[in-house]
Amino acid sequence: MEKRMSKTELTRHEIREKALQALFPLDFNADLTKQDAIDYALAYDNREIVSEDGEDLVPTYLDLLVGGVCSRKAELDEVITNHLGNNWSMQRLAKIDIVILRLAIFEMLYVSDVPNIVALNEAVELSKKYSDDRSRKFVNGVLSNVMKEIDSEA
């Protein structure tokens, strides 16, 4: 029995999950291109996104998230570092949690049509699925502090 690829549009939640799946291996494999990482993430659950004329299509928002996080990684890591407790460093964090934090902070800082609370809640949902309960609470705490700082500067 042949497995068929569904040809459907992704929700923003699903796009965030695909972005996480693309960004995570990019941290470990210097030879992996952004486009290859996105392609692998889209192929992970046998989904194929196609345009009306049948062309394979990468959702614009997925490209924005992956490209944005990649290009601003140092800046995003600085924001994370500035919001860690005294006894914490980036080296102590689980790699998946770092990627989740980068993704959410990128949305908070650079995606104007996503409310900060939505970025925070989506990150918590991703951490529930890909990390553990302690990480979920940690991600929520860090992002709550980032959100408060952003909101106070607005």
From Swiss-Prot:
GO terms for cellular component: cytosol. GO terms for molecular function: RNA binding. Keywords: RNA-binding, Transcription, Transcription antitermination, Transcription regulation. InterPro entries: NusB-like_sf, NusB_fam, NusB_RsmB_TIM44. One of its GO terms (biological process) is DNA-templated transcription termination. Pfam families: NusB. The keyword DNA-binding does not apply. Belongs to the NusB family. HAMAP family: NusB. Involved in transcription antitermination. Required for transcription of ribosomal RNA (rRNA) genes. Binds specifically to the boxA antiterminator sequence of the ribosomal RNA (rrn) operons. This is Transcription antitermination protein NusB. It comes from Enterococcus faecalis (strain ATCC 700802 / V583).
